[in-house]
Amino acid sequence: TMKKITFLLAAMLFITTVETNAQDASRECTIKYNLFKGDFQSKKFDDAYTNWIFLMDNCKDLSVNIYKFGATLAEEVRKDPVLAQRVYDQRLQYFPTKNPAKVHSDYATYLFENKLASDDAVFKILEKGYAIDPTKMGVKNLYIYFQGVTDRNKDTNPQKVFDTYDDVLENVNIKLAGYAKKLIKYNDS
């Protein structure tokens, strides 16, 4: 019985230690996140960067804002394509349901505008976004996607080109209708 008591005490001590360490890590993530967000919004990008890297390494699923703001840090402030790729990959891994079509579209735009990937690689990313929800993609990317479909199918499958044209046009119209609604709401306020 003495062995049982010793074992139970050791087990409880271990569980308490694990729980406390998890709470400390969670608390540290929250503190670093708040510092990061405040620094980012104040445009103190160097300070934000340090906390952001900590969040990217240790608190990957804390908030989608780590990736929304992080994309700006990686692409516009640091101009670091490797970091931008990491933001893209981790955001899709940890927040797969938070607007993935737009994430694909935005990343394709970044690669395309900075000439960091081949047209084929950009098309493949746009294809993923289009398959999820074309209305979440930018109009320019819908055009680039359509151009990619045309280039790949004009000689072998013209019907696919026509079908894609109709589909893209419909999605552009949906986007434009959405913009019109926002303008009306904005003008009414």
Name the predicted role of every residue range.
Residues T1-S26, A71:
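Bacterial Sec-dependent N-terminal signal peptides
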